[in-house]
């Protein structure tokens, strides 16, 4: 039973291949340790949010009620690791501390935010949670949607940039979609988290979305690893049309084949999928 480096050395020796090995610098080792620590903390948070959704009164009454209203079935909620963060300034912090997680990493991942006078608060409190996975399935960040009407709070909060989370390089749903994108040789690109989950549930699994940002060249490049065909389905309102135009300007110069689905004004992909199923595409 070989480790990966040992297997490489074994194969190289068997076939007389010269294998050049370099020693990792101390800086690279520390960087890798930090990344691993952030992945571990994000994994803890994902499990905490999921457990809160399924096993707390507030999670069931508020978080699960919202997902059920959207028509999300339990299997799709579990598949995307959806969760809920209770309306508390420090519930996640207390749980993390009780389990021995380093506060520094909670802050670096953006799960906890340091405010005035050194006070620390749970960043996603009172929100349903959409974990963001990288292509290998590791949780790199989160999106959180507020459910109560509060004009002072943004509708969505997203994890800040970190050593493991670079918004311009990642797409929501890519881990669950990558195989289907390859199989169908086509990728559906929508605007938001709920669009991805809703259409995935409707049977369109080759679907992704930017993570709270405008589409970037690096995200287009990520899709192109799996297919050269994109179908764009952005919201039918004025902002959605503007985003569509910008996305077209981003995609076509990359030499990718592009189709655009025009939704009726006031509809997003999630709304339209719930009314019409996946057949509209």
Regions found by a protein language model. Give the residues of each.
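C-terminal or mid-to-C-terminal helical accessory/interaction module adjacent to the motor/catalytic core
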Residues: 255-281
């Amino acid at each position: 039973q070989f480790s990966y480096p040992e297997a490489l050395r074994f194969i190289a020796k068997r076939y007389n291949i010269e294998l050049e090995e370099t020693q990792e610098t101390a800086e690279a080792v520390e960087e890798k340790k930090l990344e691993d620590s952030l992945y571990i903390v994000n994994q803890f948070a994902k499990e905490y949010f999921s457990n809160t959704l399924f096993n707390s009164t507030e999670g069931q009454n508020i978080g699960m009620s919202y997902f059920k209203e959207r028509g999300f079935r339990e299997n799709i909620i579990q598949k995307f690791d959806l969760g809920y963060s209770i309306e508390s300034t420090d519930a996640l912090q207390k749980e993390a501390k009780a389990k021995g997680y380093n506060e520094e990493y909670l802050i670096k991942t953006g799960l906890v935010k340091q405010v005035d006078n050194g006070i620390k608060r749970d960043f996603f409190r009172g929100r349903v949670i959409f974990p963001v996975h990288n292509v290998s399935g590791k949780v790199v960040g989160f999106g959180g949607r507020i459910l109560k009407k509060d004009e002072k709070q943004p509708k969505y909060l997203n994890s800040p940039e970190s050593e493991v989370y670079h918004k311009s390089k990642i797409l929501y749903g890519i881990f669950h979609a990558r195989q289907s994108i390859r199989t169908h040789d086509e990728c559906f690109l929508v605007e938001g988290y709920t669009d991805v989950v809703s259409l995935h549930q409707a049977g369109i699994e080759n679907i992704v979305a930017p993570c709270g940002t405008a589409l970037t060249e690096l995200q287009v490049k990520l899709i192109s690893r799996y297919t050269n065909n994109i179908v764009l389905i952005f919201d039918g309102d004025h902002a959605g049309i503007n985003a569509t135009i910008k996305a077209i300007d981003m995609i076509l110069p990359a030499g990718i084949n592009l189709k655009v689905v025009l939704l009726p004004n006031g509809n997003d992909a999630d709304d339209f999928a719930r009314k019409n199923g996946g057949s509209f595409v």
